[in-house]
């Protein structure tokens, strides 16, 4: 009997041990499955870190821009774009838009100190202008140029569709200096508003964005991008379209027209007086 009781007791203990072992194994398996699922969800839901890595072409563009800047610009604008007193302003915040306007119109690099840098043939080609602009943009920030989907500088796409609105905005904001036909005019202290005929669409836009020389800046709060495009369209039509009114006398408006009328009238009056005198 004792032996039988011992056997039953030992079997019972062995069964309980096996059940505990199975529970532990099943718990471990469930824990492993849960950890695997949690790890997978974490890997899927965790955003990939955004690491700013410049590609080789961008790095080459910036290196070229720095070389050109150090060669042609640093003496007036400083090694850190901070400007040099009595030589050149800071370029921090002007962006590639200012670089495009100043360099593509030949105003920069300036040949000499004067009241206003005139327009002339640029000394840099488009690729070099892009490189200088990229360098200034990367180190100083500011407004950028508008590009086509292929990366080229936008021009024709910057012309708006509402010429009437563009004309109204031009006469309200620009005609006091540039004349209502965009021919420009004299300002104080030897400065002047330039003729807009040679400017392309991008140059007109970047001038409005950056305010070169004495020109004010026009932010998007003052003139929306669409409003700027309408102004550009009006300027290009006014400077390119054939005028049906005969000889334009420079397109400067009432002043030369009044002078022409006065001269023609005086010549006619003198001629008439001489003819009357000869008849009598």
Swiss-Prot record:
The PTM entry states:
Binds 2 heme c groups covalently per subunit.
Does Transferase count among this protein's keywords? no
For this UniProt record, the keywords arranged alphabetically read as follows: Cell membrane, Electron transport, Heme, Iron, Membrane, Metal-binding, Repeat, Respiratory chain, Translocase, Transmembrane, Transmembrane helix, Transport
Q: What chemistry does it catalyse, as a reaction equation? A: a quinol + 2 Fe(III)-[cytochrome c](out) = a quinone + 2 Fe(II)-[cytochrome c](out) + 2 H(+)(out)
Q: What residues bind heme c 1, as annotated? A: 73, 76-77
Query: Please, what other remarks does the record include?
Result: Was identified as a high-confidence drug target.
Q: What biological function has been recorded for the protein in this entry?
A: Cytochrome b subunit of the cytochrome bc1 complex, an essential component of the respiratory electron transport chain required for ATP synthesis. The bc1 complex catalyzes the oxidation of ubiquinol and the reduction of cytochrome c in the respiratory chain. The bc1 complex operates through a Q-cycle mechanism that couples electron transfer to generation of the proton gradient that drives ATP synthesis.
Its quaternary organisation is: The cytochrome bc1 complex is composed of a cytochrome b (QcrB), the Rieske iron-sulfur protein (QcrA) and a diheme cytochrome c (QcrC) subunit.
Q: What is this protein called?
A: Cytochrome bc1 complex cytochrome c subunit
